[in-house]
């Protein structure tokens, strides 16, 4: 195989809610090849670990540890490929860093922090949910940035801050010293007006961030050059550019989802399940708001009309709980793959759970809470772990199928197929049951869709790559294995 003439590799920093990674991507024989260089853990940390006076329930991200891991990963990447031309960053949405005179104020708070729920009534006393949806087109979620900022107004640091940067923009700032806000992620904050594509001045003023938001840039724009001191640390040239990826991880994932056509839905399945369709214009109807859908911005001016639903969080939290028990009892670790294999042999459960139930929002004791929900619904709590996993899988598949059809209906077309990407696309039982319940084919893959989208946007932005990566999805189809699942009929409960 030969590398494309004149094409340099790029580095993608892909930060997820449970893990992060640094990946090298390059074009080889017209296909994108990804090399995982560094993977590291991520997750919520009690704020009290950083601030002894904080509430015991308050949650944060260890952003300094993430930055340390990113630097380590980039050093490894440049050791492997000194000719890396650019770096791009994507991450989860809504969370932010506050800065004053170039110094971060406190920690980056976690979107699952319970303070957000308490702030909802205060903001809605000024703007109704219907009015907010008309402005920003977003599904109501208590962790949206606007509610976090309303909660922040009760604390000192927002008034002291002179800059607010969303997580990927903060990492870009650390890399370049340039403060910019990439627009796919800006659209998740609730502060961006869907009709104008600019900051909503009234909301911005009401929430105390006037003059604190960075200029908006678009995917593929240059953020700036890598800082000289970091270039020396990584062994990189001074010409390395930091390029704005579609910095909301879902936007990067959707950019790399090889949709079959305009009547396709996508499910970006990780900790969250982002179920939606790609449209040219936002859907700002009462029906869309009532159904809980959101309008987020995507690559090349597209609209990601989608609904945030629970994804594999219920599975990972259940396994985490069981492994805590196993450690206390000096027993072997529980492996999700083993439980999924056992679950596939079990019948369709009689009683399902609602994965969107607020009882499942916070981490901790997940199997206990699932069992309680099943009892409350009139069912019998599962006796074994595999049985509980089977209930979760069936519940997720039912949720995915229903929301994919609803997205298509509200978008004005009949659903023809579903593409599942991300880590959840590896779950054979989940993909098959989604196809069965939706009664349409499911195409699974790619797994590393977010990193792939990040890489493709960067490659397209480079002068030598502009004509080679014009159709991102065609490149994806050439580059990865996709698995098809045909619906086989809805099985009746045993």
Segments predicted by a language model, with ranges:
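Active-site core segments that coordinate phosphate-bearing ligands/cofactors
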Residues: 2-5, 11-12, 24, 124-136, ...
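Core-facing hydrophobic residues within beta-strands of well-ordered domains
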Residues: 84, 211-213, 415
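Glycine-rich beta-strand-to-loop/alpha-helix junction loops that act as flexible
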Residues: 90-94, 219-220, 269-272, 417-425
């Amino acid at each position: 195989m030969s590398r494309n003439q004149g094409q340099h590799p790029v580095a993608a920093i892909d930060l997820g809610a449970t893990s992060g990674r640094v990946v090298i991507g390059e074009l080889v024989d017209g296909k994108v090849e990804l090399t995982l260089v560094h993977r590291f853990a991520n997750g919520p940390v009690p704020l009290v670990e950083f601030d002894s006076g904080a509430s015991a329930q308050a949650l944060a991200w260890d952003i300094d540890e993430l930055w340390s891991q990113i630097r380590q990963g980039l050093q490894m990447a440049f050791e492997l490929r000194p000719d890396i031309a650019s770096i791009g960053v994507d991450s989860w949405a809504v969370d932010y860093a506050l800065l004053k005179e170039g110094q971060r104020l406190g920690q980056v708070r976690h979107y699952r922090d319970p303070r957000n729920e308490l702030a909802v009534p205060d903001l809605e006393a000024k703007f109704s949910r219907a009015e907010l949806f008309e402005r920003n087109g977003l599904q109501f979620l208590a962790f949206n940035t606007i509610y976090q900022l309303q909660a922040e107004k009760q604390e000192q640091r927002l008034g002291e801050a002179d800059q607010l940067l969303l997580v990927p923009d903060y990492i870009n700032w650390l890399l370049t010293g340039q403060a910019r806000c990439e627009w796919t992620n800006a659209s998740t904050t609730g502060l961006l007006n869907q009709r104008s594509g600019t900051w909503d001045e009234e909301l911005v003023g009401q929430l105390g961030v006037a003059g604190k938001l960075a200029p908006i840039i678009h995917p593929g724009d240059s953020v700036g050059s890598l800082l000289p001191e970091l270039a020396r640390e990584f062994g990189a040239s001074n010409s390395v550019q930091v390029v704005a990826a579609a910095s909301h991880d879902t936007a990067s994932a959707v950019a790399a989802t090889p949709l079959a056509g305009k009547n396709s839905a996508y499910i970006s399945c990780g900790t969250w399940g982002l179920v939606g369709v790609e449209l040219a214009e936002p859907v700002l109807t009462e029906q869309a708001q009532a159904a809980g859908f959101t309008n987020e911005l995507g690559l090349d001016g597209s609209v990601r009309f989608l609904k945030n639903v629970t994804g594999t969080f219920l599975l990972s939290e259940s396994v985490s709980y069981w492994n805590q028990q196993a450690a206390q009892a000096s027993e072997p670790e529980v492996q999700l793959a083993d439980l999924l294999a056992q679950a596939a042999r079990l019948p369709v459960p009689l009683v399902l759970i609602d994965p969107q139930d607020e009882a499942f929002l916070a981490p901790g004791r997940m199997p206990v809470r699932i069992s309680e929900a099943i009892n409350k619904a009139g069912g019998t709590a599962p006796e074994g772990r595999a049985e509980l996993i089977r209930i979760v899988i069936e519940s997720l598949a039912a949720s995915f199928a229903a929301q994919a059809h609803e997205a298509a209906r509200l978008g004005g077309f009949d659903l023809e197929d579903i593409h599942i990407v991300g880590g959840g696309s590896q779950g054979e039982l989940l993909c098959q049951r989604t196809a069965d319940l939706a009664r349409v084919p499911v195409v699974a893959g790619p797994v590393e869709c977010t990193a792939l989208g990040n890489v493709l946007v960067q490659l397209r932005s480079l002068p030598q790559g502009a004509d080679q990566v014009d159709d991102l999805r065609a490149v994806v189809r050439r580059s990865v294995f996709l698995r098809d699942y045909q619906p086989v009929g809805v099985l009746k409960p045993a």
